[in-house]
A protein has these predicted regions:
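Active-site metal-binding motif and surrounding structural segment of the metallo-beta-lactamase
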Residues: 108
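Condensing-enzyme catalytic core mediating Claisen C-C bond formation in acyl metabolism
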Residues: 1-83, 177, 183-221
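Membrane helical hairpin/interfacial module
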Residues: 74, 111-112
Length: 221
């Protein structure tokens, strides 16, 4: 990168994450799944080894482990997604803003990414209201990119800050993978997904090269 490019390049100012309160050991999840998938191909000892070789010791989920033992309708799971995704996204966003020395009113654009639930209006609208963003703060919802969402969101935030060098952009990604679990789905793919994914949120603040200094002293944990 040339010195001229460096002077005009956007900056990633801060990063923060948030996880739900329920932490579960991989051994706990394995035992639960073995019981639920008993008698199916996915519940065989051979396939259950995916839990042992995942490299994961502990994950966070948004509900107690026992909650997943009961059948849940899509409406119930999605309503919980909206509630929990908003809470986690807001927690990560507030932490990222604090680390950047910013208030929500300093933001010019909010980019929100998720794939594990749906909402209309989309959650970027709910999040902007919850944070207290200015009415003219623009929003971009991105849905359905799965594991690629974080990279795509950062690219979008960079493009926005490059187009408006004075802009401050908040990007928030939230996934509640546990709420997509269907206990009646005995397919191997459901087993593998259950062995890998969890719930959480991440937020970053990206700003253009000409963004004014933050109104507060950035907090570095």
């Amino acid at each position: 990168m040339s010195s001229a490019d460096a002077r005009t390049a956007p900056t990633l100012v801060s990063l923060a994450t948030a996880v739900p309160p329920h932490a579960v050991a991989q051994t706990e999840v394995r035992a639960l799944v073995a019981r639920m998938f008993a008698g199916s191909e996915a519940g065989s000892a051979r396939l259950l080894q995916v839990f042992d070789h995942s490299g994961i010791a502990q994950r966070h989920i948004c509900m107690p482990l026992e909650w997943y033992l009961s059948d849940r309708s899509f409406a119930e799971q999605n309503a919980l997604y909206v509630e929990q995704a908003l809470a986690l996204g807001a927690a990560a966003a507030r932490a990222a803003l604090e680390r950047a020395g910013l208030e929500a009113t300093d933001l010019d654009h909010v980019v929100f990414l998720s794939s594990t639930g749906i909402a209309t209006p989309s959650l970027d609208a709910h999040l902007s209201l919850a944070l207290g963003c200015r009415p003219e703060c623009r929003r971009t919802p991105v849905w359905g990119l799965g594991c690629a969402a974080g990279a795509a969101g950062l690219s979008r935030a960079r493009d926005l800050a490059l187009a408006d060098p004075r802009a401050r952009v908040l990007m928030v990604a939230v996934e509640l993978c546990s709420l997509t679990f269907r206990r009646e789905d005995l397919d191997k793919r459901n087993l593998v997904a259950t062995s890998l994914f969890a719930d959480g949120a991440a937020a970053v603040v990206v700003q253009g090269a000409q963004a004014p200094p933050p109104p507060r002293t950035p907090h570095r944990p």
